[in-house]
Amino acid sequence: MSSGILDELGWRGLIAQSTDLDALAAEARPMTVYAGFDPTAPSLHAGHLVPLLALRRFQRAGHRPIVLAGGATGMIGDPRDVGERTLNEADTVAEWTERIRGQLERFVDFDESDTGAVVVNNLDWTRQLSAIEFLRDLGKHFSVNVMLDRDTVRRRLEGDGISYTEFSYMLLQANDYVELHRRYGCVLQIGGSDQWGNIIAGVRLVRQKLGATVHALTVPLVTAADGTKFGKSTGGGSLWLDPALTTPYAWYQYFFNTADADVIRYLRWFTFLSADELGELERATAERPQQRAAQRRLARELTVLVHGEAATEAVKHASRALFGQGELERLDAATLAAALRETSVAELKPGAPDGIVDLLVASGLSESRKAARRTLGEGGVSVNNVRIDREDWAPQPSDFLHGKWLVLRRGKRTIAGVEKL
């Protein structure tokens, strides 16, 4: 294969570990490459995008991607540091597999060409394995000593231990590589750097069972420069690709709020912008950080990628409207609700005090009634982008957007919502 894709992955900082890169570059073109994604939740999350987009980069470079949905491995679960996973019911895993399969199909191109993507489910071959075949045909090739040396396994053994179910996960993932090489001629597996041990086990198993040389490459796990966990939304949950779980507004705002120390790295990893474009954004961040040009570009690129152009424009319009630069009345109910729920929302029950002072305190925009009156006197309060300076102001039914929402703003940038119940 041409070394161009490896060069690109290199300058983007997307190669964490690999087998022999020179041997990989010498592979015939087009090469078949795969990455696997287990359905351990009803949706993929933002962290999955780096290996998933790596598949897309290989496809754009002239290679064929295989996207594997782990219908079998998702029923087992890769060992993790924090303890034994809860086993999900087979019907639940099957449902999640189909949902995730639909998400995976959005990121690579399917056609009849040599580079047309393939989506597979490892349950198709794993459920045919008998216990005897698993032990004789797979287990015989694995050293328990090597398996015990995995960092995660070692830490689990030092704690509450590990079940044989999770301990055997490596064998199932390794067998996926054997099946994909046998069925599709796959010669490269990519994944997150935490999967290196499992991927290398597959490389060895292909060599031992089929006498073939295949390759491995991992991408870095995404972390923030300040040590905080990447991909956690405002409420502390994961940043999901499913808009029913993480709204497009929350998705956009998460990436728009990326720190200067992280934004250029994220642009290299999550977008297809050229080195020249990235260089310009890096200079803009260094010289004019207050303009947040790189963050704006990152948020737009990723929101278009995951949610589409129309949803991205709706999010941008909502952001402008909330901060007084657009018409709140033009926002649809779903977009307005999603945007306000990313702020502090006060619930207004029937008969509850609804004066502006009460609303400012209830929404958290003011810490006390005295502070609320002071802010009103300074002209720093608006409701639905209309300045309010009277302490006796209270909303009329016609003030509630879509019959239930008020947008409160203190100063220029601090927003809260009121939801009429």
UniProtKB/Swiss-Prot annotation:
Cited SUPFAM superfamilies: Alpha-L RNA-binding motif (SSF55174), Nucleotidylyl transferase (SSF52374)
The enzyme's E.C. designation: 6.1.1.1
Sequence positions that bind ATP: K232
Gene Ontology annotations for the cellular component aspect, listed alphabetically: cytosol
Catalysed reactions listed for this entry: tRNA(Tyr) + L-tyrosine + ATP = L-tyrosyl-tRNA(Tyr) + AMP + diphosphate + H(+)
Entry's localization field: Cytoplasm
Cystines in this chain: none
Molecular function terms from GO: ATP binding; RNA binding; tyrosine-tRNA ligase activity
Main location: cytoplasm
Alphabetically ordered keywords of this record: Aminoacyl-tRNA synthetase, ATP-binding, Cytoplasm, Ligase, Nucleotide-binding, Protein biosynthesis, RNA-binding
Record-linked Pfam families: SYY_C-terminal, tRNA-synt_1b
Domain of life: Bacteria
An example Gene Ontology biological process: tyrosyl-tRNA aminoacylation
Binding site residues for L-tyrosine: Y34, Y169, Q173
Motif ('HIGH' region): 39-48
Assembly and oligomerization: Homodimer.
Family in the record: Belongs to the class-I aminoacyl-tRNA synthetase family. TyrS type 1 subfamily.
Stated role: Catalyzes the attachment of tyrosine to tRNA(Tyr) in a two-step reaction: tyrosine is first activated by ATP to form Tyr-AMP and then transferred to the acceptor end of tRNA(Tyr).
Name assigned to this protein: Tyrosine--tRNA ligase
Native source species: Mycolicibacterium paratuberculosis (strain ATCC BAA-968 / K-10)
Species lineage: Bacteria, Bacillati, Actinomycetota, Actinomycetes, Mycobacteriales
